[in-house]
């Protein structure tokens, strides 16, 4: 089984079935503070099948095995993961770094066993990388 953020699936074959689950009231709280989607879709292949995921902004998709080492991800970078991967909200210990460091106060910690697929450039990072190249209209 693969779980992914709502809207991340691009296409799938007939043998793959989708289940949508919400995190309940606790999930709504986590979604509100972490910036991740309230709904996760689970995909299960009843027979051999294929599924493809896509991103909503420019960048790359990076596969990471979190079995040996947990990973802290910025909001909106989690695309999909194996069902064995746990996702939890992570609070920055240094409040100043969260507010002024561009990392955000709340992130997502991903622990294994299993693999996750991450979007490498959240829209905020894209905007920050393009800002110096934009000429101000004076």
Language-model features, listed with the residues they occupy:
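Composition-driven recognition of glycine/serine/threonine/acidic- and proline-rich low-complexity segments
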Residues: 1-138
């Amino acid at each position: 089984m693969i779980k992914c953020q709502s809207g991340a699936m691009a296409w799938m074959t007939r043998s793959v079935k989708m289940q949508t689950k919400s995190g309940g009231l606790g999930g709504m709280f986590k979604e509100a503070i972490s910036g991740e989607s309230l709904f996760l879709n689970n995909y299960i292949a009843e027979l051999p099948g294929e599924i493809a995921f896509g991103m909503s902004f420019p960048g790359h998709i990076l596969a990471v095995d979190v079995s040996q080492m947990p990973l802290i991800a910025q909001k909106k970078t989690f695309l999909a993961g194996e069902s064995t991967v746990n996702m939890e909200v992570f609070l920055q210990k240094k409040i100043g770094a969260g507010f002024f460091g561009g990392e955000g106060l709340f992130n997502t910690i991903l622990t294994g066993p299993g693999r996750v697929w991450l979007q490498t450039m959240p829209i905020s990072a894209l905007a920050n990388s393009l800002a110096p190249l934009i000429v101000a209209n004076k």
